[in-house]
Design a protein with these regions (language model features):
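Active-site and channel-lining beta-strand-loop segments
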Residues: 63-84
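Short, hydrophobic/aliphatic alpha-helical segments
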Residues: 35-44, 73-80, 131-132
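Non-catalytic, mobile gating and regulatory segments of ester bond hydrolases
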Residues: 1-31
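Glycine-rich loop-to-alpha-helix module at the N-terminal edge of alpha/beta enzyme cores
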Residues: 2-11, 81-163
Length: 221
């Protein structure tokens, strides 16, 4: 049922939003219903670049300040309710602020606080569970972010193979490390969105086009 609905959605034509409609939406919604968000973001900009700590929070005409989350709903500082299609970029797949997860996190915090920097039994339990659910993951190591994971993967691969070149999917986001900031968002854009990264850094980085095996094969030959 769900797959059929998604297929039907994908087959629908792409419509663009007219400038007049967008302007009306800004005035009718953001200007009238998101006043506190705008005020707080303007204040945050005085000390935080862009007013937010993560790019996912950027929004036009200004970021929305969220103060509550539960299940598939988000609530902003002005009291507006939203359906959460972002899911924190992917990790909150069971919804936000799940009761079971929250209670377990609180229990752990009461026992040893937010961090000790040392090993905890749950680290092994998580690694084992992931390996059981995804058999191809024979070994599992957690890192602080996707950027660090990609940096580590590149280094390990180079060490294991003795090769230098890296091939990434064009248009895909592989973190903010210098060597992978190539062809981001749109395939074939090369270093268009790599401001501040010297060109020589990409000497061993290439990209292939998504869903194009021939493009990948040409890079591998």
């Amino acid at each position: 049922m769900l797959n059929a609905e998604l297929d039907a959605l994908i087959k629908k034509p792409i419509y663009s939003i007219s400038r007049s409609a967008l302007k009306e939406y800004e005035e009718e919604y953001f200007a009238k219903k998101c006043k506190k968000s705008k005020e707080q973001i303007e204040e945050a900009k005085t000390i935080i670049p862009g007013g937010v700590q993560h790019n996912l929070a950027f929004n036009y005409p200004f970021p929305i300040v969220m103060v509550k989350a539960k299940g598939n709903r988000l609530y902003d500082v002005d009291g507006n309710e939203y359906y959460d299609f972002l899911q924190a970029g992917g990790p909150t797949i069971i919804g936000s602020n799940d009761d079971v997860v929250r209670d377990k996190v609180i229990e752990l915090l009461e026992d040893c606080g937010p961090s000790t920097g040392l090993f905890h039994p749950y680290e092994y339990k998580l690694a084992k569970k992931i390996s059981e659910c995804v058999p191809s993951v024979e070994m599992f190591r957690m890192l602080g972010s996707g950027t660090e994971a990609c940096m580590c993967a590149v280094r390990v691969a180079r060490l294991a193979t003795g090769h230098k070149n890296v091939i990434k999917m064009g248009g895909a986001y592989h973190g903010w490390s210098d060597q992978l900031a190539w062809g981001m968002r749109v395939p074939g854009t090369l270093n268009l969105q790599s401001h501040g990264v010297p060109l020589f850094v990409f000497k061993h980085t290439q990209e292939f086009f998504p869903n194009d095996l021939k493009s990948l094969e040409r890079k591998l030959i």
